[in-house]
Amino acid sequence: MTILRQFFRPRRPQVRRQLPPSHWVQPWWVERYKEQIKNQKLEPPQSNNVARSWTLTGNLDSSHRIAVDPRGLITVKPGSWSLDWWLGVDQTWLYPAQHGSVRQRLVDGAPVVETVIRVAGGDVIHRVYAARVDGEYIVVEVENRASRPLALALAVRPYDHLGGGRVDQIELNDRTLSVDGDVALICGRSPGRLVVGTGGVDPASLLNQTASTDRSITCETGMASAVIIVPLVHGSTFRSAVPLGYTNDAQVIPKLPSAQQVASGWGKHAVSACRFVLPPGLINDLFDASRQSLLLASTGKDVEPAPGAPPRESTDGAATLMALAEAGYRTTVREILISRAKRQDRLGAVTHRNQDVTGATVIAADRALEVAPDPSLAHALSEFVADGTRWMLANPVDGTAEALIAAHKILVRVGAEKAARELSNLLIPIVKSDETTIEQDENLDVVELARSAFELAATDPPEAWRSLEKLASLASPTSSWPSRVNSNTRRGTGGAGHDLRVTAWFVRAVLRLLVDDKDECLRVAAVWPDQWHAQGVEVHQVPSRFGAVSWAVRWHGDRPALLWEVEGGPSDLMVIAPGLDSTFQGEGPMGEQLLAPAAPQNHDVWAPSDQGGTSSSGSFS
């Protein structure tokens, strides 16, 4: 009978995920759509293809990546719900998605996102970042630096940064808010009240009502929404946390690190890999932030460079892994390569998200072993490379020729002479085009622009800087890029709103202009922008196939002095610095040379920021 009752029990109608009615407070991308078409009556599309821009945050070596939109909306569970924030001032409510005086930034270039709104004579700062305390959490805190007390509303919304969602049930139990049976938000203190909306009613329209005693809401159409409201006096901060796993620890809030502590941790990871002291400017700021956010591409076992975008090319994963290796994140790359090798099937293939990444893995492994020699890792990967080579020979695709050359280099490196010799007879020369064509329509492929900057860095450094300048102009205030962008609105139109493939190519391009080991000689300072004239630069411990490279420039009047050191570099190493002195040729792994007088070249490279100052100079110890 129990089985029969379950079989004949009325089933809840399945409603497709859709945006709430137009009279609701909508996400930022819908507001931008209305602004763009200038027709408030026209219904917005059900999926976001007009403003695909956001910023990712998360923990190191974690599969959880959380998107924060330009107004602070947090997509906690894509396709289901997000967490918004609103402010109440004298019975008037401000919605950041609709407000013009909102700006966004990172804390010290780390994936700690601050959304700032100017209100009541000061700033209110909304912060989002990830932390680990016996589990993973997204910390959400709001600080009142305004001159007056405010009301803060945190709203569970049945939509996200890409389109509609679905929420059936919301319940508040003391300081814990649950969505569809799962703990969704843990508050630092008990909320003052809960405002709920169902049946098509937006709780945003009920915020000033004080009679509500509701503690839960159920909506069969999947449009449940609820708002917790707390007072926020001047100088105070309200903290809460979104668990990224199963937890009911209501006492976790005091244990969570501060935003500054988390930002410092990210910065230490970047500096421990390699360190740079560059003149202040937009490129420097983006380079600093990009080297940190690049780590978000790693899940610990693989790379996810473009969350929210359809698969593109397996070589994008290779470029991301190579960027991690070239930026000095040796341990991260090692763990990913070992994880992929363990997943290799009997035929020699390895896949990721149903995509063959065998060749991409071999290419990345070759570069990783080239810039950071690791005999134990090389031997551990040798069988993987041999089996993968057999698979690639039997199943050639675009990029196979490059992958086979990489495989040959690895086999030579581990002393597998017979296998390397057999493979060398099968290698096909790689013919690359001289230049990459970028589409010149209003929807710009940002991934290709970044890729072309990297390629140009080897052959035409000044043109590479101009590409980097264009790329920098398309970056968000939080140093992120979408996959495709409208060149007029500067908003994403396709793919991922924060595409770490762009970040990877950008980092590789800047690194190649600073330290390039592509040819038989070591090239440093490939280009020297006018804004750097008479300013010192320091580069420390950049991985290369010659060894870890450090160099610095000091100025003596109009003459730059170049110091360089390559750990373990060959005694006959040739060093050039064409951006400073095209006639200079240094020899040896260590040296110092006073170069020819240099004058600004009037290269139209990039516009610097308003910051001033010069880098310090000193030894590499």
Model-inferred region functions:
Residues 300-303, 343-352, 396, 475, ...:
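Acidic/His metal-coordination segments adjacent to aromatic residues that form catalytic metal sites
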Residues 216-220, 268-378, 436-466, 471-472:
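Substrate-binding groove/exosite segments of carbohydrate-active enzymes
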Residues 138, 240, 286, 293, ...:
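Alpha-helical packing segments of well-folded alpha/beta enzyme cores
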Residues 398-425, 446-449, 455-473, 478:
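Extended amphipathic alpha-helical segments enriched in small hydrophobics
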Residues 221-256, 347-356, 360, 376-377, ...:
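The feature captures the catalytic groove of carbohydrate-active enzymes
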Residues 1-285, 329, 333, 447, ...:
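Terminal accessory carbohydrate-recognition/targeting modules of carbohydrate-active enzymes
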Residues 170, 178, 185, 234, ...:
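Aromatic-rich carbohydrate-recognition surfaces in CAZymes
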Residues 159, 339-343, 387-391, 429-430, ...:
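A short structural micro-motif
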